[in-house]
Amino acid sequence: MKPENTKQSSFYKRLFALVLPMAAQNLLNALLSASDALMLGLLDQSSLSAVSLAAQVQFVFSLVMDAAIIGTTILAAQYWGKGDTRAVEKIQANTLRISCAVGAFFCIAALTVPQLLMRLFTPDEELIRLGASYLRIVSVSYLFGGFSQIMLCVMKNTGRTLRSTVYGASSVVLNAALNALLIFGLLGFPRLGIRGAAIATSIARFAEVLLVLYENRRFKEVRLRLTDIRHGDRDLFRQFRRHTAPVLANEMSWGLGVTMFSVIMGHLGSDAVAANAIGQIVKNIAACFCNGLGVGAGILVGNLLGAGKLDQAKEEGGRLVRVSAVSGIVSGIILLVCSPLVMRFAGHLTGEAQGYLRFMLYVCCYYMIGKSVNGTVIAGVFCAGGDTRFGLICDTVNMWCLIVPLGLLAAFVFKWSVPVVYFLLNLDEFTKMPAEWIHYHKYKWVRNLTNERGAEST
């Protein structure tokens, strides 16, 4: 076999060993959301709409957690590639101090002011009442998630991707099973409806915490130590803060923009809300491999950069861009083929909501291409080398200077139809591509961050 073919074979072997387990877990998570929607939809359309809007609180929480996870991946992948396991332990402890505080904040907010949170997304009193009851119960899951998600992230970055997937998948399966039992009152359990879905989520998150604590005792190379949590590492914290602050700002800027999408759709009627809820679930299912590819790209390139293999990282970054484009196209085609099947499962919606959903599914097909490429390049390749400021600038300008104003004008000034508004809101992944392409070829992301430790304080 030629050296070039051997190199490519090694690349794809390492890539798919990372991506396939994560894609499988993403798929399970998306299917869980789909099962939630299906079960709640069988109750009534109001329950489905209320939970989809209440889930925006979880979405904002996930934005903060995603920033912490990306920041952890940036450093953990590079230090693991270098072979410095003690640094990885300290990175894990530093991040947990932050993520657990974030989880506590969201828990308190969802527990004490759920009606206020719901009013941000809809004026409908019935949806506010139902959503508030859901938020009160699910609030404790933010505490558990703040801990378990960082632990699972470190597992992915330290050669335990498959085990991380098994733990995450176990939590998802438990959640789905409890949903069925508690929403409908099967096998002698009480019929709790929307409250049952919240209880199931909280129990599943707690089970996930127990699993990662077991893993912490089992795996000897990287352990969570109480001394690291109490004292921390100032140099690593400064390095984490430097590279994570732009990611957090980027996640919040982009995420609040996407939340504005829900606000806009929420004020266009319950039919638009219900169709958008199912459309978002289907979009998430279709993007499972694309999202896994983005995370895998960050780990793969980060390991190489940390090991000092800058030329190889640059070469494999190019391969990842090409793979991401193909991944997006294939995902879009699969979604197009499966669209009629999705419509059959949406028979409980009103006729108008079904019409909206049919159009939304077509939009999601081409959306996958931009989603895949941007997720791999901006959140994966760029972040692997600590090049996080570009994403902040690009997403903020794109979202708040173009897409959100365009959506607001279309919905509330020009009074355009729901399909037109939805189409405009889903241009965000494509309008930033030219700037992203130019920045990629500057190669500012080709950096070994482990050589910069200690320089943050100077």
Language model feature labels by segment:
Residues 23, 27, 31, 35, ...:
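Generic alpha-helical transmembrane segments of integral inner-membrane proteins
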